[in-house]
């Protein structure tokens, strides 16, 4: 199993930095592989990628490879960052939405996590139910005659 994490930080302005981490949770190392992702937040022609080779982009499709043919051992994580984004992401699904790895003539599925803000803790969800207060006695019958 492969797992991809996404994070975003607002620097450098105006669109910030997109960071990706691919973790090999499988039982075999990845050798001579590429990572493909689809994302609504695209990398523009004027960009900087650190820790990976940016092979190509076609619309929302992006393909990356490790530097110098590095392999990804079992339990290891490959991290890289990209600057020069089309826009800042606004939602947790604005980074990699789908991903797959091509290795050894096979296409391997990748589980993708939601985008997180790298510079801030995640916001707590709102309460699911309002705080309740009983002002009348509780009735177990569906339609009691009186309370």
Language-model region placement:
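Generic structural motif
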Residues: 1-10, 54, 98-101
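Short acidic, flexible loop segments centered on an aromatic residue
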Residues: 23-57
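Terminal connector regions
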Residues: 53, 60, 70, 74-143
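Beta-strand-rich interaction surfaces with strong enrichment in secreted/lumenal proteins
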Residues: 8, 66-71
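N-terminal carbohydrate-binding/catalytic regions of secreted carbohydrate-active enzymes
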Residues: 147
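Generic recognition of long tandem-repeat/solenoid scaffolds
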Residues: 16-22, 56-68
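Short beta-strand elements of extracellular/lumenal beta-sandwich folds
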Residues: 2-31
């Amino acid at each position: 199993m492969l797992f991809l994490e996404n994070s975003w930080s607002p620097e450098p302005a105006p669109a910030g930095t997109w960071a990706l981490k691919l973790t090999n949770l499988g039982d075999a190392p990845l050798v001579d592989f590429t990572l493909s992702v689809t994302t609504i937040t695209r990398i523009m022609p004027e960009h900087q990628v650190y820790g990976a080779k940016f092979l190509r982009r076609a619309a929302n499709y992006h393909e990356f490879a490790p530097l110098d043919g590095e392999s990804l051992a079992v339990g290891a994580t490959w991290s890289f960052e990209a600057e020069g984004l089309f826009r800042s992401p606004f939602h947790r699904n604005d980074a990699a939405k789908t991903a797959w790895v091509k290795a050894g003539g096979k296409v391997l599925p990748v589980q993708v996590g939601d985008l997180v803000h790298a510079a801030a803790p995640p916001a707590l969800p709102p309460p699911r139910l309002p705080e309740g207060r009983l002002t009348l006695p509780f009735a177990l019958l569906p339609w009691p005659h009186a309370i």
